[in-house]
Each structure stands twice: as C-alpha cells, then as structure tokens.
Amino acid sequence: MGKIKKKGTSGQAKNYITRTQAVRKLQISLPDFRRLCIFKGIYPREPRSKKKASKTSTPNTTFYYTKDIQYLLHEPLLRKFRDQKAVAKKIARSLGRGEVGDAARLEKNHAPKLTLDHVIKERYPTFIDALRDLDDALSLLFLFANLPSDAHVPPKTIALCQRLCHEFQHYLITTNSLRKSFLSIKGIYYQATIQGQDIMWLVPYRFVQRVNGDVDYRIMATFVDFYTTLLGFVNFRLYSSIGLRYPPKFDTRSDENGAELAAFTLEGRAVGDVPKAIEAGHTQRSSSANKEVSRDIQAKVDKVIKSAGLDQAKDEQTAETTEESSDTIDKFEPAAPEADTLAQPDLSGSQAGSLFAPFTFYISREAPRAPLEFLLRAFGCKRIGWDAVLGDGAFTNDETDPRITHQIVDRPQLPESSLPAIPAAAEEDSGAVQKVKPGTRIPGRTYVQPQWVWDCINEGKLVRPDLYSPGATLPPHLSPWVKPSRGGYDPRASLAEQEEEGEAEMAEDSDEEMEEAADEKSKTASKDEAESESEEDDDDESVDGGMDVAGTDDDESESESEEEDEDFGGFEDDEAASESEDEEEVARTQHQKELEAEAAGLPFSSNGATSDASKKKASQAKKIAAKKRKEEEEIERQKMMMSRKKRKLLEKMMYSNKKQSEEAAKLRSKRRKLEKGAAK
C-alpha cells in the first residue's frame, strides 16, 4: 500500500512560494527583497490556481517560483544587505547616544557599497543580449537626466544619467547609427541600429517637470542603479569597438555653461593620438591613404596580368565586382497595384552620414536646440550655430554669418509693426555679435521649421523646404514605423488616389441634399416667424384685454356700406380660387412623383423632369450597386466551397477589413469637408 502524500509537498504548492515566505527564507527586509529581485530579474508569477498554490486557507496575491528563491540564496548581494543592516544599527545607536561624529564616520568609511558587475555578466552573457535589453534602460535614464533635483532624486544621480546619455549619443554621432525619429505627445522617439539590433527609446520634452508624490522613487532608483551600470558596460564596449578611449574627456566648466555634447572630447586608443573629436573626415583621410597604397600595388599587378595576356578576363571580373559593390539601396515596388506595400530597406551608415553634411545650420532661440543638434550631428552636419543664450559649443553665434545655409525657425509670421526694436549696442562693446531684428530674412538662406529635419531623416532624403517655411501649414508628421496598409487611410496621398469608385459623387449628392434640407428648414423657420409676427399685429389691434368696444350707429352704417361695396368683386375672386386649386393639384402630383422616385431609388428634380446629369449619376449608382452585389455573390459562392474553419477565418478577416474601410471612409469624409471649407 502506497504512502499517503502530505498536502503542500507536490504540484503547485511545491513549485510556488509566497512573498512572505521568500522574505523569511532569505532573512532580509521587504525593500531589500524588492531591490534584489529587480537586480536579478526575478518577477512575480501567476499560478493556475491560487488556492492550490497557497498552503493557507486564504489565497495570497503574490507568488514566486520556488527555484528562483532557492537561486537567490547563493547571491553575494545578500551579504552586502546584511552588512548594511548591521551598519545602520550602529549608526542609529551612535545617534541615540548623541555621537554625531561617530555616526558620520561609520556612514562614510564602513557603509558597504554594492557592485552590480557580476549581476550584469550573469544576466547578459553576450553583448547582443545587452543591446536587446537597452530600450528600457535608455528611456529611464533619459527621463532622469531631464528631472529636477529634489529630496527623492539627488543631483549626483541626474549628473550620472546625463553623462552616460551624452556618451551614448556621441557614439551614435561618430558611427552614424541613428536611423529614425518621431515627435509624439509623450516625447521624442529615436531608433538606432547597433550591430544589427534595432534600439528604440523615448526622450521627454524639456518642459518644467512637476514631481508627484504618488510615484515610488525607491523602486525607480533601484532600476536607475542597475541601468547605469548596464549602460556603462555597453558604452565601454561600443567605444572600444571603434577604437576610442572610454570614458571620454569631460570639461566641467563647459558643461556648466550649457555645452552638453560639446563638453566631451573623444580620443583614440593609439599611443600617438592627439585628443580630438573623431569625425567622418578623419576616417576619410585614412581611407584615402590606404587607397593610394592599394593603387600602387594594383598597378604592379596590372603589369603582370597584361604580360600574361589575362587583361580581358580581368576586365570582366572588375565589371562584375563594380556591379556587386554598388552601395545604392534597391527599392522594392509591388508588381500589381492591389498588392501589399513592401518594406523598404533603411539608410546605410554612409548615406546617413552625408544627409546634412554640406550644410551649415543656425538654430533660433525658440527652437529646441538639444534634439536638433543631436539629429543634425548624427546625420553628418559638422557646422551648427545658435545664439549665445542657448549655451556654449556653437560653430558660430553670429546670425548674420554668410556661411549659414539653413536656419531653423519656430516662430509665427508677425507684421513688422508689432515687432520690438533692437536696442543699440554700447560703444565700448565693440566685439558684440550683431543682432538681427526678428522676422528679418537674410538673402541666400533657407528658412525651415523644425519638422523639416525629422521628415528628411524619416524619408531618407531632403524634402522640399518650401512646404516647411515659417508660418506655413505643415504636412502631416507621421510615424515612420507605421506603414499605410491596403484599404487604410493615408494622409500623405490625395483623396482621388484613395477614394473608391463613385465615392466622391455620392458624397457630393449627400452634401447637396443636406444643404437643401437646411435651406428648407430656414425657409420654414422664417415663414413661421412671419406668421407669428402677423398674429401679434392682429392681437395688438384689440383693446382692453382683447375685448372690442361697441361702435356707434354711424360706424355701423359705414361698415355696412363698405361690406355692400366689397360683396361683389367681379370675376377676380373666382380666378384666385381656381388658381389656388391648381396649385394644390400641382403640389399633390409633385409629392406623388417624389414618392415614386424614392421607391425606385432615383433622384427627383423639382421641375418634374430628370436632367441628364442626374440620369448619369443614377446609372452610375446602379452600376456600382450591381458590381458590389456581384462581388458579394462571388464571395458567398466561394465560402460554400470552404471548410468551416477556413470560412470562420475568412469572416473574421472580412469583418476587420470592413471596420478598417469604414474608419478610412470617415477620415476621408472629414478631410473632404476640411478641404471644401478651405477652398471657400
């Protein structure tokens, strides 16, 4: 006879452990347990049955895998947590005795420091694994880099996050790894490609951040501690892979003056390298030197091949290699107009590095300098200027510099009379930069709004700058990661390209009907107002609360004589009566014809005769309805030949496509009304 199993020794009760049991088993406090789980990447699990997993009568809410907690028993961080607890007790004892100096000494010299290097190596055995988990790290660190310092967020943490983020941005600028960017309500999205891995992160706008009390900053600070260590490892590996020293030189004074990216100086790892910011020009010079050496070698090889009579075969091989080594990216176009939109390849590093290379930009005071500087430098621009108010590190602070080719402006077009006058500079300040009056256009310079930079990057080419001139209505700024699907709405395409057959005509007819109905309502309303006014006039003629005063005998005789004169009006009254009867008959027949036309589905004109245009519209509507009916019958015929599973799948697809087409039709009708209103 088998042994009876005890309850809670197998199954879900053995595989799961509650949070209280885990804290007791590890012998640490609950905040330390949370920190340890964040560092090690252990998170709560949801069992199939909480009642079976719980060993008590009341089912608990938080469960962990028993094996995960068993794995944490051998973690070296547990000893650090216990040492911190012991030092905290000693500090509390010293403060209780009034020994403030001893408490400060214990906190400074004996407080254990946590090192997460071994945790990073355990969680990310390869560098690709670390790159795949870099999205959340960058988003959180960029968020803390833009937060104001307070009791919850110390200044040291903010400075560390800013330094790591700027170092990562310098790598993207040097290697031209940035690919796309998008302006959203939440912030600015960036996407970079590093060693074949797409990394996307979010950077908040530089508004004044208000720190709320409902945010648990202890949990976020734990993530910041882990992610700063991770990004430090990643930056070191990235800088080493391109031959740069890490960390780069950092100028504290320049950073205090608002230089940001310009406060860092990159230098190579070779012994004879001079500290400098490595740019694309340096790599081009080294590559040109290698080309000169290779040309000499190639000339000697050509002589040997020519003497051997193999020059013809060599020419064929070189032709093949030149065809294969072309750096242009192929564009995939669908073979049929109804086919799906094919995904296009992204920009290469050389193309991204030369997009803004030949230009010199000047950023106005009202434009966001930090994201624009990062984007322009990441896509090849070496000369970026801005006003001295925005900080150090500019190529030029003079707005009238003739070398400037593009100026980024984000202010409305105002008349010159409303602009303030520029105060005259002091005579002793002879070296002051010349100020330009707001709204002044310098000849030979292209003025654009900031969205032009983002749209050029997402399109992979320079778009028309006249569409982004100051004061112009900007084109729609669409997400580069959402591609227009078949049957969906595309804001960039015109209405004629997206409308279905006969959709525009039907929309015009419906608009005309709505206008006619509105006119009829206005006419009836005006008629009712006129009738009410006439009734009020009749009421005003009555006296003393609506009672008429009895007239005298003379008045009665006069009224009787007038009635006798008005009794016979000749043949005019008979003609008016016949005319009113004819009008009633015409209205009755017109109403009958309207009912017949409505039953037949045809438009009806008030004059009783259908015009040629209305006949054409009616025939076109009939053709469209017949075509739709034929397509529906064909689909029903095909569904009859399908199995039940495939038929259900087809119905789901048709339902989703119908919903998508309805949403697209709503957006098209809205756009049609807006364009019609703008045309008026």
From Swiss-Prot:
<feature type="compositionally biased region" description="Acidic residues">
    <location>
        <begin position="530"/>
        <end position="543"/>
    </location>
</feature>
<feature type="coiled-coil region">
    <location>
        <begin position="496"/>
        <end position="523"/>
    </location>
</feature>
<feature type="compositionally biased region" description="Acidic residues">
    <location>
        <begin position="551"/>
        <end position="585"/>
    </location>
</feature>
<comment type="similarity">
    <text>Belongs to the pescadillo family.</text>
</comment>
<feature type="compositionally biased region" description="Basic and acidic residues">
    <location>
        <begin position="629"/>
        <end position="639"/>
    </location>
</feature>
<feature type="region of interest" description="Disordered">
    <location>
        <begin position="472"/>
        <end position="680"/>
    </location>
</feature>
<dbReference type="GO" id="GO:0000466">
    <property type="term" value="P:maturation of 5.8S rRNA from tricistronic rRNA transcript (SSU-rRNA, 5.8S rRNA, LSU-rRNA)"/>
</dbReference>
<dbReference type="GO" id="GO:0000463">
    <property type="term" value="P:maturation of LSU-rRNA from tricistronic rRNA transcript (SSU-rRNA, 5.8S rRNA, LSU-rRNA)"/>
</dbReference>
<dbReference type="GO" id="GO:0030687">
    <property type="term" value="C:preribosome, large subunit precursor"/>
</dbReference>
<comment type="subunit">
    <text>Component of the NOP7 complex, composed of erb1, nop7 and ytm1. The complex is held together by erb1, which interacts with nop7 via its N-terminal domain and with ytm1 via a high-affinity interaction between the seven-bladed beta-propeller domains of the 2 proteins. The NOP7 complex associates with the 66S pre-ribosome.</text>
</comment>
<keyword id="KW-0698">rRNA processing</keyword>
<dbReference type="InterPro" id="IPR010613">
    <property type="entry name" value="PES"/>
</dbReference>
<dbReference type="GO" id="GO:0005654">
    <property type="term" value="C:nucleoplasm"/>
</dbReference>
<keyword id="KW-0690">Ribosome biogenesis</keyword>
<dbReference type="GO" id="GO:0043021">
    <property type="term" value="F:ribonucleoprotein complex binding"/>
</dbReference>
<feature type="compositionally biased region" description="Basic and acidic residues">
    <location>
        <begin position="519"/>
        <end position="529"/>
    </location>
</feature>
<keyword id="KW-0175">Coiled coil</keyword>
<dbReference type="GO" id="GO:0070545">
    <property type="term" value="C:PeBoW complex"/>
</dbReference>
<keyword id="KW-0539">Nucleus</keyword>
<dbReference type="Pfam" id="PF06732">
    <property type="entry name" value="Pescadillo_N"/>
</dbReference>
<feature type="region of interest" description="Disordered">
    <location>
        <begin position="310"/>
        <end position="330"/>
    </location>
</feature>
<feature type="coiled-coil region">
    <location>
        <begin position="613"/>
        <end position="680"/>
    </location>
</feature>
<comment type="function">
    <text>Component of the NOP7 complex, which is required for maturation of the 25S and 5.8S ribosomal RNAs and formation of the 60S ribosome.</text>
</comment>
<feature type="compositionally biased region" description="Basic residues">
    <location>
        <begin position="616"/>
        <end position="628"/>
    </location>
</feature>
<dbReference type="InterPro" id="IPR036420">
    <property type="entry name" value="BRCT_dom_sf"/>
</dbReference>
<dbReference type="InterPro" id="IPR001357">
    <property type="entry name" value="BRCT_dom"/>
</dbReference>
<dbReference type="GO" id="GO:0003723">
    <property type="term" value="F:RNA binding"/>
</dbReference>
<feature type="domain" description="BRCT">
    <location>
        <begin position="351"/>
        <end position="470"/>
    </location>
</feature>
<feature type="compositionally biased region" description="Basic and acidic residues">
    <location>
        <begin position="586"/>
        <end position="596"/>
    </location>
</feature>
<feature type="compositionally biased region" description="Acidic residues">
    <location>
        <begin position="497"/>
        <end position="518"/>
    </location>
</feature>
<protein>
    <recommendedName>
        <fullName>Pescadillo homolog</fullName>
    </recommendedName>
</protein>
